[in-house]
Amino acid sequence: MTVHPTWVFDSSPIPDPHGRGERAVKFFRALKHPKSTAPKNAFELAPFWERILRRIYGPSDASGNRQVRTVYIQIPRGARKTTFGAGLGLLHSCGHEKVPGGACILAASAEDQAELAFDEAKAFIKATPALARATHIVDSELKLEHLASGSNLRAIPAEGDVQQGKTPYFVLIDELHVWKSRKLWRALKSGLLKVPNTLLVIITTAGRGQDNLGYEEYSYARKVATGEIVNPSYLPIIFEPPAKFD
């Protein structure tokens, strides 16, 4: 198994002129998780996830606008992608990346997966006193709200109501390769274009076959990763056998 690009595991510098990457890392390190075995249930941020955080949020222009707008992460099972994705949702709904009234979405392939994503976000909140005080959870709607800013985070299934994805500020897509319907995908992508400084993050394991959304996005991500397509706003991170990049 290898990863492309190689900066994920090396010590090369990652630009962070406005400190947004460092703030993102500090937010994750301040989180607590009930399943953590670290002292005081501190969330253990793996070094490669930290590098990814810094690469998403660090590079920015002179005005502080984030360079990256879309992130594609293809990663093997067991890497805690659902937990990391929930943390990103909290960063944008309750942390330094939140905006007043911002709509943040965790979109999964099915209802049970949406519930799993929301449960991870809820676990962070209940174990982290500062977040517990700052938020209101509505379990029946798989939704939480940051009380002071009105920003909210909602988990929805791919076959859910497309109206829920009208104008999101942050979207995390889980396991795109098993999405059967394209309606919500199109609605979310269209909605992101209506709001400034949005972020779309796709986190998935490798899929099978080529007739699906996941393969289409993987194909584009791979072309960016290999330099065939130049798109600084698109960040591909692909874990797969070395032969794939020969």
What are these language model-derived features?
Residues M1-D246:
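Phosphate/NTP-binding elements of NTP-utilizing enzymes
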